[in-house]
């Protein structure tokens, strides 16, 4: 499940959990964990209870969670004194603003992809809003702010999210790219997965 992936080490090419000599999962070397509107240790149970309360996410085909990643520039740790603890605090405050009313796991790793060392934060939210909130600027459907409404990862929402990340980085004096401009070179999902598994070409 989501919590196991975020807490324990996994082989990046196979996705399988890495075990020690006693066949126990290896905890990640450094991580920071918080829960938003939930206890992180019981995130899955609390999400299930929320879904049942609102009679949502009962079919296998329904989207039950959304996973977002905030990836900080590797130079931030060297030049800007960014630590895993500081990134966790920043990301938690951002999550409170971006995902009000949702149950969420906020987990920061300091290892990066393939040991690159870039600090990054995972935000995993239950797709069903637990509590009603004030209507937000990106909401374009009626009643989108009410409890029980399912999260919609629309372009309007994503642009709002990206701008908030950029503003946070500027405010904190961190390196950041223009997330709202199209990338010069696009990488397909197949190319990304090939790179992740260590292949140079498809």
Which functions belong to the PLM regions below?
Residues 1-202:
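N-terminal nicking endonuclease/strand-transfer module with a His-rich metal-binding environment
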């Amino acid at each position: 499940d989501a919590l196991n992936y975020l807490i324990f080490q996994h082989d990046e090419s196979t996705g399988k959990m890495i075990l020690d000599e006693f066949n126990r999962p290896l905890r990640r070397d450094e991580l920071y964990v918080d829960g938003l509107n939930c206890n992180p240790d019981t995130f899955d149970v609390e999400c299930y209870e929320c879904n049942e309360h609102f009679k949502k996410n009962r079919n296998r085909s329904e989207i039950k969670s959304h996973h977002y990643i905030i990836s900080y520039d590797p130079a931030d740790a060297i030049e800007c004194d960014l630590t895993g603890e500081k990134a966790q605090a920043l990301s938690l405050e951002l999550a409170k603003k971006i995902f009000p009313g949702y149950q969420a796991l906020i987990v920061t790793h300091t290892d990066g992809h393939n040991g690159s060392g870039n600090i990054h934060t995972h935000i995993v939210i239950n797709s069903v809003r637990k509590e009603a909130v004030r209507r937000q600027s990106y909401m374009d459907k009626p009643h989108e702010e009410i409890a029980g409404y399912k999260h919609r990862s629309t372009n309007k929402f994503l642009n709002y999210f990206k701008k908030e990340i950029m503003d946070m980085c500027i405010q904190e004096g961190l390196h950041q790219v223009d997330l709202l401009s199209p990338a010069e070179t696009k990488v397909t999902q197949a190319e990304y997965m090939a790179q992740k598994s260590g292949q140079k070409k498809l």
